[in-house]
Amino acid sequence: MNIINNSENVCTGVKIWLCICCIGILVMVFIGGITRLTHSGLSITEWNPVIGIFPPVTEKMWIAEKIKYMATPEYKYITSNITLTEFKKLYLIEYFHRLLGRIVGLVFLIPFLYFMYKQKLSKNLIHRFILIAFLILVQGVMGWYMVKSGLIDRPHVSHYRLAMHLLLALAIFYLLWKHFLLSVVHQIKCNIKVTNTSVFYIIISLITIQITCGALVAGLNAGLLSKDIPFLSDKVGLNDLLFIKPWWHNIYNNPITVQFIHEVIALLILIIVVITLLVLKVRIFPMYLLLALLLIQLTLGILTFIYNVPIILASLHQVTAFILFASSIYLLHYVKLLQIQYVKNKI
């Protein structure tokens, strides 16, 4: 994750474009949370990348879409009493999520082709942006692969595929954010000496693991099972955490265990950030920003859990995880600039 030694000098248009793409990903993550929490994701039973851009417009078309939905496990086991009006609401939420995905893809692709044609990008950047374009395409396929898992014999999507879908979004966001930072933040004015970056890599790694764990929590509906916080409750014992055999399957299949791990990692990240700030005395703006965002994220997570996963709160919790991840990347970027500045000052 070397994001310093290759600082990029690009035109203002490229910087704005990268920023818009990052915002687009965040909006997608937020809308994706709403789509999942409103149980809208399985309402569209086909994947049509081109003609799927047009929604049903007549009553006959809507009825045809509902008939397709009636063949799904979700309809058979959960929503068999759904009216056409209610179905339209679910359908339009999923439709908007897919439409936004197409728009974000085009917002990346069209300016990329333009900047490449105008020779505004270096050869290295072109190669990296081709990778991002490929990942965006794969993400579309991954989204359908996830939805398909809920159309066969279970009324919900695979939590593994849900986690893969979210992690792929995180990878795309990371690449866009990294290049945005490289193009915008070149130098800083600060005299603090930081000799080791290991702790910052640990923070980034833990946040990434936490986002993965959060996806598993969401996919397993772990936040809805009990209002006893596993980490704090005396009602949750070892047998609850390890009842699946072999024991390691609990790590990714047992909702109680996954929720427990999610809480422990959150506490661990907080402890490491506080130690870095107070004990290691890395008192720089990105460190304070990370701590502030972490406290906001912890608050959102606790409120989401206590209030039975309300849609807006839970969606904010999901997108704030990406913003927290972005702040950790910014922190590492800043620290590496400090190291370069320190070496230059010594010379």
Swiss-Prot record:
It catalyses: Fe(II)-heme o + 2 A + H2O = Fe(II)-heme a + 2 AH2. GO terms for cellular component: plasma membrane. InterPro entries: COX15/CtaA_fam (IPR003780), HemeA_Synthase_type2 (IPR023754). Keywords: Cell membrane, Heme biosynthesis, Iron, Membrane, Metal-binding, Oxidoreductase, Transmembrane, Transmembrane helix. It is an enzyme of class 1 (oxidoreductase). The keyword Lipid metabolism does not apply. GO terms for molecular function: metal ion binding; oxidoreductase activity, acting on NAD(P)H, heme protein as acceptor. Catalyzes the conversion of heme O to heme A by two successive hydroxylations of the methyl group at C8. The first hydroxylation forms heme I, the second hydroxylation results in an unstable dihydroxymethyl group, which spontaneously dehydrates, resulting in the formyl group of heme A. Belongs to the COX15/CtaA family. Type 2 subfamily. Interacts with CtaB. This is Heme A synthase. It comes from Ehrlichia ruminantium (strain Welgevonden). The gene is ctaA.
